[in-house]
Amino acid sequence: WQRHTHITKLKMSKQEQKDEHKQTDGSPEVKAKIRRMQMESSANAARQQAALEDVPNATAIITNPTHFAVALQYDVGSSNAPKILAMGRGKIAEMIIERGNESKITIFQSPLLARALFFSGDIGAEIPEMLYQAVAVVLAYIYRVDRGENLERPDIELPKDMRFDEFGRQLAMGTGGYDA
């Protein structure tokens, strides 16, 4: 009888079995969240890759000089806001810049604006309303330079909550008023 009692005590309860399974294989909720994030990342990368075909239709490309690139399209006289045709970071950004150069599209370097557009906008959508003023300044500058005017590069002022670092974290309120 002593032996039988000892063996029974060694057996795991159903809850202990579940807990051990979660410890060794990970909880189903965490695994599902990881799978969902991987799927979203993959879909986003596919959208960025497909958007590269639209770069030749861009009005301007805003860059950070190599890490981020956002291709914008704006029709003068249109009542619509500028639209994001393509955007990417790293290799995709390099490809956007390369295609922009091939298509003779004006490239404007503005790290803060490029990151703001990247982290707050979506491919195929209009730019966020909070960035209208900054993008308008850039597009006006580009149109005038493309017409042959010799202008000084404008300072781009962004709303405080639209300033991001390269990881998408908002910058502290006191970090620079103009383009960094």
Task: Place the predicted regions along the sequence by residue.
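N-terminal cationic and glycine-rich segments that engage phosphates or anionic surfaces
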Residues: W1-G88, A93-I97, I107, P111-F119, ...
